[in-house]
Swiss-Prot record:
This is Catalase isozyme 2. Belongs to the catalase family. GO terms for molecular function: catalase activity; heme binding; metal ion binding. The lineage of its organism: Eukaryota, Viridiplantae, Streptophyta, Embryophyta, Tracheophyta. The active site is at 65, 138. It comes from Gossypium hirsutum. It is found in: Peroxisome. Homotetramer.
Length: 492
C-alpha cells in the first residue's frame, strides 16, 4: 500500500474556487441572502462549510512543548559504529537518512516568547529504511525527576497557577523542595545557558540511557549528544528582555531565515558508551536521568552529523501535526530501564492519539517513508487506501510473513514487586561539581537567579531553609552565600 497515492495535495489545486467536495464556487465574498439586505439562508452550504471549517482549525496544543519550530534535513554517519549496533541507518560511514527536527520551549503556550528561561526540546525523527526512529530529547543532558510517576505533578507545578494563570516561583520551589534530585537540572536551567540565543546555537541531548545491540546480540548502554558546529550561545537577562520585546518569535525566524539563506545549521552527534556489566561500579545509577556520565570516564565519541537544509512547507502539517514518541525505535536500538523513559514510551504515543487521533501515524510528517504493512486499520480519520480481503494474521491467502528476527537485550531480571526510590540517589555531588566549574562571575549570576526566585513573598521560611540546605550539601560556600543574602541561617 502506498500511503501517499490518494493523499490530497495542493499540487492538484484547481484554477478556480471550490467547496471541500469539489463543487465550483462562483462567489466567495458574499453570503446567500433574501434580497440584498435580507437574512442569510441556512441553505448557503458554502458559507456553513467555510465557517464550520474555520471553527475547527485549532487542535489541542501539546500539554508541554507547545511552542516550537521545525525544519528538515539529513543525518550522515561519519564514524563506523557497526560493532555496537545492527541499526541499518548506522551501517557504515557515508550513509544518509532524511529527518525532521522540532525545537521547542517546554512549559508555556503556543505563541509565548522564545526568550523565557525554560528547557528547550530537541526532537529528531529519522526516516530510516526500517521505520522511524524518534530521538526525543532536550537541550540539557539531565532532567528534574527520575520517575515518571511524578511527571504530571511536575508539569502542574511548572505551569501557571490554575487560579491566576500566572507562573509563580513559590509553586515551583514548593514542589521541587520535595525532590532534591532536581538540583542538577537547576544548575543548567538557572545557569547562563538557561536562555539559548536561538535554536541553532544550543546543544541537544537524548537525556535518557538507551541500548545499542549489535548483530551478535551484545548490548551497550549509550547516551546521545548533539553539538552545534556554530557553538553554544545564550542570552543574559537584559539581552533576553531586549530580544523578546522586539520579536517574540525570534528563534523560529532565525531558524527559518538561516535555512532560506543557505546558512544550514549543523550538529555533530556523539555517543557515550557503557558496558551494562559495569553499571554497578559507579557512585551513581547510569539509568538515573538526573545524572550525567563523567566524560573523563565515558568520553564523547563521534558518530555522525545532522544538517538542516530545508524549511518545512506548512507549519500546521509539519509542526503542529508532527508527533514524536520515544517508543519509536528501530532494530539495533532499544530502550533501557530508565524509569522516566519507560513511562514516556506510553505517555507520548497516548497524548498524540488524543491530540491528533488514533491514525496520527498516517499523517505525512509522521508516516514512515519505507514500505510497511499491518492490520491496524479503520478508526477516525483513516485515509489509507486498502483493497485487501484478508485483514487478519496469519492466513494462507495472504503471503505476508513475520519480519526477520533481530536481537533485543537478553538481560535476565528478577525481583519482587515494589514501589521504591533507587539505591544510589547521590543527589548533591554532580550539582556541586557543576557549580564549581563555573567562573566567578557565572557563579554570581547563578546565585542572583536563586536569590530572585527564593525572594518570592509566598516562599515560606521552611522552603527557603530546605533549598539552602540542599545547596549547602552540593557546595558549602554556595549555600552560605544564598543564606547570607536572604538572611536565613543554613540548617547544616
Amino acid at each position: 500500500m502506498d500511503p501517499y497515492k490518494f493523499r490530497p495535495s495542493s499540487s492538484f489545486d484547481s484554477p478556480f474556487w471550490t467547496t471541500n467536495s469539489g463543487a465550483p464556487v462562483w462567489n466567495n465574498n458574499s453570503s446567500l441572502t433574501v434580497g440584498a439586505r435580507g437574512p442569510i439562508l441556512l441553505e448557503d452550504y458554502h458559507l456553513v462549510e467555510k465557517l464550520a471549517n474555520f471553527d475547527r482549525e485549532r487542535i489541542p496544543e501539546r500539554v508541554v512543548h507547545a511552542r516550537g519550530a521545525s525544519a528538515k534535513g539529513f543525518f550522515e554517519v561519519t564514524h563506523d559504529i557497526s560493532q555496537l549496533t545492527c541499526a541499518d541507518f548506522l551501517r557504515a560511514p557515508g550513509v544518509q537518512t532524511p529527518l525532521i527536527v522540532r525545537f521547542s520551549t517546554v512549559i508555556h503556550e503556543r505563541g509565548s516568547p522564545e526568550t523565557l528561561r525554560d528547557p528547550r526540546g530537541f526532537a529528531v525523527k529519522f526516516y530510516t529504511r526500517e521505520g522511524n526512529f524518534d530521538l526525543v530529547g532536550n537541550n540539557f543532558p539531565v532532567f528534574f525527576i527520575r520517575d515518571g510517576m511524578k511527571f504530571p505533578d511536575m508539569v502542574h507545578a511548572l505551569k501557571p497557577n490554575p487560579k491566576s494563570h500566572i507562573q509563580e516561583n513559590w509553586r515551583i520551589l514548593d514542589f521541587f523542595s520535595h525532590h532534591p534530585e532536581s538540583l542538577h537540572m537547576f544548575t543548567f536551567l538557572f545557569d547562563d545557558i538557561g536562555v539559548p540565543q536561538d535554536y541553532r546555537h544550543m546543544d541537544g541531548s537524548g537525556v535518557h540511557t538507551y541500548t545499542l545491540i549489535n548483530k551478535a546480540g551484545k548490548s551497550h548502554y549509550v547516551k546521545f549528544h548533539w553539538k552545534p558546529t556554530c557553538g553554544v550561545k545564550s542570552l543574559l537577562e537584559d539581552e533576553a528582555i531586549r530580544v523578546g520585546g522586539a520579536n517574540h518569535s525570534h528563534a523560529t525566524q532565525d531558524l527559518y531565515d538561516s535555512i532560506a539563506a543557505g546558512n544550514y545549521p549543523e550538529w555533530k552527534l556523539f555517543i557515550q558508551i557503557m558496558d551494562p556489566l559495569h553499571e554497578d561500579r559507579f557512585d551513581f545509577d547510569p539509568l538515573d536521568v538526573t545524572k550525567t556520565w563523567p566524560e573523563d570516564i565515558f568520553p564523547l565519541q563521534p558518530m555522525g552529523r545532522m544538517v538542516l537544509n530545508k524549511n518545512i512547507d506548512n507549519f500546521f502539517a509539519e509542526n503542529e501535526q508532527l508527533a514524536f514518541c520515544p517508543s519509536l525505535i528501530v532494530p539495533g536500538i532499544y530502550y533501557s530501564d530508565d524509569k522516566l523513559l519507560q513511562t514516556r514510551i506510553f505517555s507520548y504515543s497516548d497524548t498524540q492519539r488524543h491530540r491528533l487521533g488514533p491514525n496520527y501515524l498516517q499523517l505525512p510528517a509522521n508516516a514512515p517513508k519505507c514500505a510497511h504493512h499491518n492490520n491496524h486499520h479503520e478508526g477516525f480519520m483513516n485515509f489509507m487506501h486498502r483493497d485487501e480481503e484478508v485483514n487478519y494474521f496469519p492466513s494462507r491467502y495472504d503471503p505476508v510473513r513475520h519480519a526477520e528476527k533481530h536481537p533485543i537485550p537478553s538481560t535476565v531480571l528478577s525481583g519482587k514487586r515494589e514501589k521504591c526510590i533507587i539505591g544510589k540517589e547521590n543527589n548533591f555531588k554532580q550539582p556541586g561539581e557543576r557549580y564549581r566549574s563555573f567562573s566567578a562571575d557565572r557563579q554570581e549570576r547563578f546565585i542572583n537567579r536563586w536569590i530572585d526566585a527564593l525572594s518570592d513573598p509566598r516562599v515560606t521560611h521552611e522552603i527557603r531553609s530546605i533549598w539552602i540546605s540542599y545547596w549547602s550539601q552540593a557546595d558549602k560556600s554556595l549555600g552560605q552565600k544564598i543564606a547570607s543574602r536572604l538572611n536565613v541561617r543554613p540548617s547544616i
